[in-house]
Amino acid sequence: MDIVILAAGCGSRMCSTTPKILHKLGNAPIIKHVLQLADELRPKRAVIVTNAAVNGPVAALAGEHNLRLNTVLQGEIAGTGGAATSALQALKNPSEEIVLILYGDTPLLDKATVCHALDRLSSGAKIVLVAFKSENNQYGRIVLGSSGNVLEVSHGRDTNGLAVSGAIAGYRQVISGLLGGLSCRDGELYLTDIVQSAAEKNVEVGYVIADERKAMGINTRADLAIAESYFQCMKRASFLQSGVTLTSPDQVFFSIDTQIAQDVIVHPYVVFGAGVAVEPGAEILSYSHLEFCHIKKGAIVGPFARVRGNSTIDRGCVVGNFVEIKESSLGEMSKVKHLSYLGNSTIGKNTNVGAGTVICNYDGRNKQHSDIGNNCFVGANSTIVSPIKVGDNAAIAAGSVITEDLPPRSLGIARSRQTTKPEYKTRR
């Protein structure tokens, strides 16, 4: 099977300078979801039709997958029919009979639905549409004959009949031949017009029925919001089924690549940004925001914690309230419980970082790195001016501003000595 992805539309109804397929769904561009589906289907070849505005970003996203993806620009003929023609021409020396055409703005279509359509091909149909029930009048509708055969796809504003998603599976030679016979409407070729042409030539057209939420296209911000809501519902259901505890599922938000193992507990109002993996037994408390980080077994994060920038929280660690960790690693059983910022640092095992500790990692031009060893104690309200190395079993006195390395088992004190004036209040 070969796959064609049509992603050259301008998306003017999004009212945005950002191309439609690059808007985010599940914290990833819409088109990434379609590329992920294509990757799961393991086609022999794949072609994506884009425009100049998205060609570079799409090529970069395609590189994240194992697809043999050929990117071509929309040809002179506008419309989905023109795009499909350009794509099929790019698939030179065809070796596959079947071609699957996907739309770049239909991100939630799943493998099961596509496989159902492909199975329908094997039962006699030459072209198979993906249809769904919808009250939304923006979609084309399947028109059936008296015997139940597909006659055409109507583009009126009514909501009678099944809507079509645009995705089509079929035999390459059949689709190519039908595309070649289409006429332009309003200066464009419409891919769905091949349905009427097929019916006129007694070519059997079938359809499979999908869930509207999976088959919907995204054309407006409202559509994007609906798709995001359903994406989150699917993610929540998947994690609950796999053994993750979500104490209030509707208040937890995931990304396309979120990985959470069984026996993790997630409390309300947690946001998982891109690139997060959480190992078994960890607990994420409310109002925490995680992105590009690895939370290992038994760690506790939050509430009100932010972990980001390729950070690692090791086994049994505690990251408490109002703590931010960026581009840092926290060793096994270490704790940073309150009101702290750790940036560009490596913290060893069994180290305690006191409340209000700040690692000053930016010198005005570059980020600097600090290392704190195993079994260290960092007193409250300490400031560590990177780059600093603190040896194993060392301690930093509360309120210190550390600007020099500390050898193992040493105590660093960097603050003014206290002055006490007896009876000061009485004299005044």
Curated annotation (Swiss-Prot):
Disulfide bonds: none annotated. Residues 243-428 are annotated as: N-acetyltransferase. Acetyl-CoA binds at residues 355, 361-362, 398, 415. UDP-N-acetyl-alpha-D-glucosamine binds at residues 6-9, 20, 74, 79-80, 103-105, 140, 219, 308, 326, 341, 352. It catalyses: alpha-D-glucosamine 1-phosphate + acetyl-CoA = N-acetyl-alpha-D-glucosamine 1-phosphate + CoA + H(+); N-acetyl-alpha-D-glucosamine 1-phosphate + UTP + H(+) = UDP-N-acetyl-alpha-D-glucosamine + diphosphate. Binds 1 Mg(2+) ion per subunit. Its EC number is 2.7.7.23, 2.3.1.157. It is found in: Cytoplasm. GO terms for cellular component: cytoplasm; membrane. Gene3D superfamilies: Hexapeptide repeat proteins (2.160.10.10), Spore Coat Polysaccharide Biosynthesis Protein SpsA, Chain A (3.90.550.10). GO terms for biological process: cell morphogenesis; cell wall organization; lipid A biosynthetic process; peptidoglycan biosynthetic process; regulation of cell shape; UDP-N-acetylglucosamine biosynthetic process. Pfam families: Hexapep, Hexapep_2, NTP_transf_3. It comes from the Bacteria. Its cofactor is Mg(2+). HAMAP family: GlmU (MF_01631). Catalyzes the last two sequential reactions in the de novo biosynthetic pathway for UDP-N-acetylglucosamine (UDP-GlcNAc). The C-terminal domain catalyzes the transfer of acetyl group from acetyl coenzyme A to glucosamine-1-phosphate (GlcN-1-P) to produce N-acetylglucosamine-1-phosphate (GlcNAc-1-P), which is converted into UDP-GlcNAc by the transfer of uridine 5-monophosphate (from uridine 5-triphosphate), a reaction catalyzed by the N-terminal domain. Homotrimer. This is Bifunctional protein GlmU.
